[in-house]
Structure formats: structure tokens, C-alpha cells
Amino acid sequence: FLILIGASLFWYGKKREGITYMAVLIFSQIVNFQTKAFFSLPRPTSHEALIMANETTAGYPSNHAQNGIYMFSFLAWIERRISLSVLLGICIGISRVYLGVHYPSDVLGGWMFGVAFLLSTTTLIEALEEKRLIRFHDTVGKRVAFTFLFAFIIFFFGAEPEFRYKVAPLALSAFLVLSFLEMDWRVPTRTRLVVALVMGGAGVIVLRAGLKMLFPATIPFDTLRYIILGAWIALVPLLFLKLGVAEKKT
């Protein structure tokens, strides 16, 4: 779901925002996993709270709180609308305490990490816009080098094997395709945006489920499945342009 939010921004034509969001989101998951492993703080026990969900990882910081405040606040920053989105992010953190799976300190820690990654993302985007950093469209070689470096970090510092063999291939595939896709586009109307999101999302669902039934349940084929998904996310704007759903920026 969190990756689809970034894909949706990308499909909308907010290329820089979507790519930066996904890269920072994936990096934030690595930091969350490593922080949990470092502190190894326990979650509430049945003697302290009514536990309504099953969790097996350490408690601090709350990943749900971190992701919630990061995702909704970033969307609010893009649209320059703060109140509702930030409120939703806060509610996710509060719900984790209500479900008995986190202490308030876990949630506060998650919020702090989420805000830190939000500020990192917005600062990076603004720096890219002002060309204070290497532009995303600078050279193909730089983009390819960054892609492989990013995939290396995900694979060796990521969390469980599922993260390494699914998220890393998806990100590598999507970013690698984008390294050679030198164009900008926009979806001019809300109606066309809905069509673009339905087309892109339906493709992800069909490919993910269809290839799962077609391929054997092994790590190499799971990796291949997510490589194909990453390529679809990056290439589907070409279909939008072909069908007139999107138009090239001049």
C-alpha cells in the first residue's frame, strides 16, 4: 500500500515527488528495523493491556506510527493541505496504543522518526528543484549507479528476507527503467487521474496475483515477479500517453 502511494504520485506526473517518496520510505523501513534490533524494547504484555493484535517484532519505534505520520504528512505537503492528513497520521499511532501492541513511548518515537524522514524528503525535493544537488535527469550513468547502490543497501541492511527479495527487486527494476525513461508527463484532469490510477493499480493487482499463480513458490520466482511489477510501475505512463490519459509536458 505504501509503495502504491508513491507509484500513484509518479503516475499522476509528479515524477520527482513519487521517486523521492519511495526511496526515502524504503530507507526509513531499514532504519526502523535496525533501530528495533538495536534497542530490542519489549511490547506491552497481557498483564498491562488488552492485546488485540499479534506482533512479533520489538516495540520501539512503532513502524505504523512512523509510516502513518510520514505518508499522510508528505501528501499534505504536496497538496499544501495540512489538517486532515496529519490528523490521520496521528490517529494511526494512537490506534497502536489502543490495540495494546505499543507503549505511548513507542508511538512517540515512531512519530519523531516519521517527521525526520518527512523533513529529509521535502528538503531533498526542494534541493533538486533548485538544482543544488545532482539533478535526477543529469546522466543515465549516474542514475544507474544510484539505483544499484540503493538496491545494495536494501538487500544487505533490509529487514526480513521478504523485504530483501521483494522490495529490493521492485525498487531496482523501477528505478533502473526510470534511468532510461527521459520524459515528463502530466494527467490534466481528475477524471483522467482516476482512469490512470485504476489502470496502474489494476495492472499491479493482476500481475501480482497472476504471476503468483503462474510461478512456483520459490525465492527466485518471487524476485522475478517483483522485478516485473517494478517495470510495470515505471512503464505504465507510456500506456497513459498512448491512450491519451496523460500528455507530455512541454
What are these regions (language model features)?
Residues 1-9:
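First transmembrane helix
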Residues 185-250:
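C-terminal regulatory/interaction regions
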Residues 8-28:
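Interfacial segments of alpha-helical transmembrane regions
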Residues 13-14, 87, 215:
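Generic signal for short, ordered secondary-structure residues
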Residues 4-5, 19, 29, 33, ...:
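Membrane-embedded catalytic cores of phosphoryl/pyrophosphoryl-handling enzymes
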Residues 12-13, 39-40, 100:
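Short helix-capping/hinge motifs at transmembrane helix termini and TM-loop junctions
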